Structure formats: structure tokens, C-alpha cells
Amino acid sequence: MRVLGIEGTAWAASAACYDDTGDSVFIESDPYQPDSGGIHPREAAEHMGEALPNVIDSVLTHAAETVDDAADTATNDTDSPNRYGIDCVAFSQGPGLGPCLRTVGTAARAAAQALDVPLVGVNHMVAHLEIGRHQSGFDSPVCLNASGANAHLLGYHNGRYRVLGETMDTGVGNALDKFTRHIGWEHPGGPKVEAAATDGELIDLPYVVKGMDFSFSGIMSAAKDAADEGEAIEDICFSLQEHIFGMLTEVAERALSLTGTDELVLGGGVGQNARLQSMLETMCEERGAAFDVPDNRFLRDNAGMIAVLGAKQFAAGQTVAIDDSTVDPNFRPDEVAVAWREGEQSVARGRGVETASPADGATATQSAGDRHGRQRGAEAVVDVIAPTDCEYELPARCVRKHRLSKAYRHPALDTTLTGERTTAEARLTSEARAAGVPTPLVWDVDRETATLHLQHVGEADLAERLTTDAVTTVGNHLAAMHNAGLVHGDPTTRNVRVGDRVWLIDFGLGFHSGHIEDYAMDLHVLRQSLAATADDPAPLLDAVSDGYTAVGDTAVIDRLATVEDRGRYQ
């Protein structure tokens, strides 16, 4: 099979020919470079109009020259309009800049009609994921997409790519560009930040993680202020990378923990950054997870990934009629019907428990519901031990939770975060309990070693026992916390324990607040974890709202809609 791919969502006018016979991809690209500032949509669209015919022509010339090497192609007749052996035309249908997408759509329709072959509409962000899966050979990885206008975590479950976490304001590349424009550097800003960061030292900047979501607006404002106040640009660039990429690596680890998978791929143009790659690789090594990064030519915007995914969709019968091929600037990856993966393994596999082997100290995996052994989450190792094994005389089974130092993070930043979160967990766990929410008793806290001893509660994580009754109760509990001015910060299905009661645990990201926005964000984090991993999330999402409104302020539910609309391309 041979596929002509066409890309042009923002800045790269690109065409490619993918031949599945030898798994070869030929790419021709012509990037748009603004004279000043960032990308100007009208100018970018004009560039697409001028550059796309040339890159398409170059790719078709290559296809014609190599058509004899292709097998099972549409035709090898040199007198045919399709003397290039092309079986279909795949194009970026969205998301992206509307003027650019419309130009690409027009070019793709014209090419499909001229070649007399079917048309395939491809989601640009899913293509970033699929090229990573294609090159790595992974079965069902989590994908961290870090690109100009986007930053999110995706995983496959029941016929869709679910959004596990995402930016709540701007894409990571655009965030870096905003800073570099502020100090007078030309587009693109990311490579310039990376170069300057080699000589920098750490300064304090905001670090914002909420569940598996994150925000860049605060850190960008702080970075601009630091530049205006005369802070060394090298130090700001270094600190931007340490904080932003630390946030992305942390949420990627949280996604691995939530789903139980042990495979991670990186996508998007910002993924070319060596520091980000190093952080993710270190994190995966510490977890025993596999990590893969596609070739650089597949990380930046390119038509090769469009052609590769187009081939999968074409083989699955996912073509689109010319009349139905309208582009969509807000095309979310979780809207795509993933027919080419029907019946394949879900990313949600359940979290295992490590147990020491008496023979050699190696680890084996038990079911997540087993209450004995050592369980590793995103931040900590948790040992469930008998009272006699504790350093203190305790009345019941004990949980020893030790927050691990993260080698991927800057040591100073890591020390600050682990200490603050250990203290916050101890304080908020007790305060939530005082507000009437079932939480473990805290028996001891040691900030220096980042270790807590807590009461063991429940029989399993909510993730293993999802029911509407349990989720309704979680809604009740969050409302009770909010009524007391407390925010959980990370109420995912892994941070709720169920048994004779429903318990909230792991308050490390918690804080005090009287703001309705923070309460709505708590609900969003819970709902997102349900939507990402449940087979039938709709009744569970309703249960969250029902449980919350029975106890809490209905204005929080109203604000929730606003919060969820902030996700990219909602």
C-alpha cells in the first residue's frame, strides 16, 4: 500500500509518501517562518497555498521514480493519472489553524480527485501518537504529546483515545514562544530556550500540577516578570525547562500509575528537546517502564505521520467522502473512532503490587487488590505492614508511605516538592477527617525522610470497584471537604479506597481554598479519571454531580462546565 500524506495545520507545509512494503516514508517539508513575532494565521495560510503544490509535486515525483519497487499498489500503468501507485490521500483534518487547514483540505481533495483514489481524514494529534506506537512496536502505550498548541496525555480504551490529562490553558510550545517573544527572540522559541538553558541555574517559579492536568500561564507570567526585573535570561530559561518539563514528566508518571501500563511514547515538536527526553527516560527507568521517542523528523509537524496513520485508517475502511471532508480546527483526539485498533488491548490494565522474592530480592507482581506487599504509585512506595513491623506501637494494620526522590527533577526542586507534599498530606488528611470525610488516621509524619505512617483503610482502589454508589459517595465527600475550605488536589480513582466505607486518601496535592474554581477543578480531576478509564463513564459522571449537589454548592457544578471547556479544543 502507498499513501500520499498532506500536512499543514500551522507552520509546516509538508507532503509524504508512505509505502508499507518496506515501511518507508519519504517526506518533503517547507516550514513557514514569520518575519517577526509568532505565527500569523493569514500569512501561514498564504505560505501553505504557495508551498503545498511544490512539496506534493516533489513527493509524487519520488513516488513515480520508485513505483516499480512498490507492491500491491493501485496501479503501475504509466498512462494512468495515478502512475505513482498511490492508494489513498490522507490529510490533516484538524486540529489546527482554520485558514491553514482549509488550504490543506482543498489540496487533499484536489489530489484525491486527480489520482482517482479515496480520501482519509486524519487527526493531527492522534497521528503524533500513532507514529510513536508504530516506530516503537509498543502494544498500548500512554502518549505524552508536547507540541506547540497542545500538551496532553492519551491512552487507548474501548475504541477511543482517552484524554488522561492536558493543559488547561496553552500548549507547551506556545508557552515558551510567549516568553521568548517577550524578550525579543524570534520564532520558534523552544530551541533558543534549550540553548540558553545550558548555562543557567535554578530560580523559583510556579509549579502547577492538578491531578494529571497542568497549567503554564502562571509560570509564563512569572518568567516574564523575572526578565523585566533583570534576572539572568540563562537562569530563567534553565528554570523554565526544569519546572515545565518536570511537570510534564510528573503527569506522565501519574498516567502510567493510573492505567497500570508500562509503555510511554513521546510526540510533538517540543519532544525534540533533549532535557525533556532525558527526564522521561530517567523516570521510566526508575519505574521499570519502556520509553521510546520517534525520529526527530516525526516529532515536528510532518506529513509522514499523517501518511502512516492514513494507511491504518484506509485498511480499516475509514475513508471520507469529498462532501464530508470539512476540516475541524477544534478536532479533539478523543472524538476519533479508532477502528484500526478494534479488539486491541486497553491502556488501562490495573496497577500491580511488588513483592520481594525470598530467593533473590527480585520483584513479582500481584493483583492490585492484594493488600499485602509493596505497591508503587506515581510518587511513593507504599508498604502495608503489621503493627509489630512498625517503629511505633500501633493499634491496627499500618501503611508506611515513602515519597521517593525523583532523579529526573532538579535536586532542589525535588526536595521542596517532596517535603511540601508530605506535610500537606498529613495535615489535609487529618483536617478532612475532622470535616466528616472518611480518611486514614495519621500516626506519624517525617518530613526529612518524606515518610508517613497511616491507618490501612479499604479493600481495593475505586479503580478496581467502580460503581455508581461509590462514585456518588466520593461526590458527597468532596462537597464536605469544600464546605470546610479544603481541596483534595488529586481525587482520581487511585486515590479513593472502597470496602465497608468509601475513603479518600493521598492528599499530597491538597491545599486550603475558598475559591469555587479550585472546587470545580477537584471535580474535573475525578471526572477525567473516570472518563479516561471506565468502560461506560456516562452514569459515573452523572453520579459525581448527583453526589456533590446533595451536599455541596450547585454553583460549583456550574463552574465545572467552564473549567472543562478550557481543555484544548473543547
Question: What do these predicted regions represent?
Answer:
Residues 2-95, 102:
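N-terminal beta-alpha supersecondary unit
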Residues 5-8, 144-146, 153-231, 317-329, ...:
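A short helix-loop
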Residues 24, 68-81, 195-264, 275-285, ...:
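A contiguous, well-structured pocket-lining segment that forms one wall/lid of small-molecule binding clefts
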Residues 117-142:
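Conserved phosphate-binding catalytic cores of ATP/NTP-utilizing and phosphoryl-transfer enzymes
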Residues 122, 281-306, 319-323:
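Conserved phosphate-binding/catalytic loops in two-lobed NTP-binding clefts
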Residues 369-423:
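ATP-binding glycine-rich loop module of kinase domains
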Residues 418-422, 437-474:
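Conserved structural core of kinase catalytic domains
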Residues 507-570:
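C-lobe/activation-segment region of protein kinase-like
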